């Protein structure tokens, strides 16, 4: 069945006012979907000057260029990793800018936390008005990964029981985070209700502390192992075709990539050669799509065995 657009009947985007009661979403629905993927975008905006001459450190989704920046990533992630059995939801949120987060990294957490407040409001709206009793996958990249960690802590127990899995991509899950009952590290290919976390580097020395320096978990996004078992695969994206090997460093919990011959843009202010933060989704897009589908299948198999067919929030 061809993927179709949202229940609101727009061509690609749901255009609604940015407000607490009705957040603004990109929505792509599929009338055959049995699961939802709720995605939170990474940092796609830069500092800007308002009409009063002030430097602004948060995006403004009423500005077309800010909205377009998020749309570009969101649409790309939808097309790359969302299985045919999932509908896709992603909030347009007034995220912190790249300079606002990384020029002074002591501001990273408080500014991400402020932006995440909108994400939580959007998720609550999604659960109440758009979820329609579907199990759901959470996924966030970089700043969006921070939001996923905080959103996991925000879930009610009943909501947590309906989560297929959470993907924290290009960000860390700390020992403190793991003390929360909704955050449990993935151990294999198809366990459910778990949190998947990975950060990719050529070597552990290329890690960026503010993003992955304190991560307490990691999994290899090719073989989905938490052991140091190498996985060789073909990376074919953007005209590149390289044979790569992904190995989990069980001390740093980082994924070590060997064989990559291309370039990766350095993150402003904190970037290091050999850090593959800009490639966290392209490096593994085929494996991610397959893994999301596997975990969704496992979730629905469990629900069938439990004779549980609907959820109420």
Model regions and ranges:
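C-terminal motif of bacterial Sec signal peptides marking the signal peptidase cleavage site
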Residues: 16-17
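Active-site catalytic motif of lipid deacylating hydrolases and related acyltransferases
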Residues: 40-133, 264-312
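Surface cap/lid and interfacial helix-loop subdomains adjacent to catalytic sites
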Residues: 115-132, 153-298, 302-311
């Amino acid at each position: 069945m061809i993927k179709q657009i949202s229940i609101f009947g727009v061509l690609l985007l749901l255009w609604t006012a940015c407000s607490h009661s009705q957040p603004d979403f990109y929505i792509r629905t599929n009338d055959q979907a049995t699961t939802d993927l709720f995605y939170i975008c990474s940092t796609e905006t830069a500092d800007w000057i308002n009409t009063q001459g002030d430097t602004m450190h948060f995006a403004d989704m009423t500005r077309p260029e800010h909205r377009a920046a998020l749309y570009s990533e969101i649409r790309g992630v939808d097309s790359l990793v969302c299985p045919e059995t999932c509908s896709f939801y992603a909030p347009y949120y007034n995220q912190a800018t790249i300079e606002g987060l990384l020029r002074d990294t002591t501001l990273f957490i408080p500014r991400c936390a402020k932006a995440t407040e909108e994400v939580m409001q959007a998720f609550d709206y999604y659960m109440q008005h758009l979820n329609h009793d579907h199990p759901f996958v959470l996924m966030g990249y970089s700043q969006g990964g921070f939001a996923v960690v905080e959103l996991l802590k925000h879930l009610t127990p009943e909501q947590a029981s309906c989560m297929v899995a959470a993907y924290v991509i290009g960000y860390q899950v700390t020992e403190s985070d793991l003390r929360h009952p909704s955050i449990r590290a993935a151990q294999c290919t198809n366990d459910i209700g778990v949190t998947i976390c990975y950060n990719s580097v050529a070597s552990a020395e290329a890690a960026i502390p503010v993003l992955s320096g304190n991560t307490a978990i990691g999994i290899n996004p090719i073989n989905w192992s938490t052991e140091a078992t190498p996985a060789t695969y073909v990376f074919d994206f953007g005209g590149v075709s390289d044979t790569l090997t992904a190995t989990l460093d069980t001390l740093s919990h980082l994924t070590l990539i060997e064989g990559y011959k291309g370039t990766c843009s350095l993150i402003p202010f904190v970037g290091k050669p050999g850090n593959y933060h800009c490639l966290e989704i392209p490096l593994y897009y085929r494996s991610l799509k397959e893994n999301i589908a596997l975990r969704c299948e496992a979730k629905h198999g469990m629900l069938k065995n439990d004779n549980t067919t609907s959820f109420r929030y």
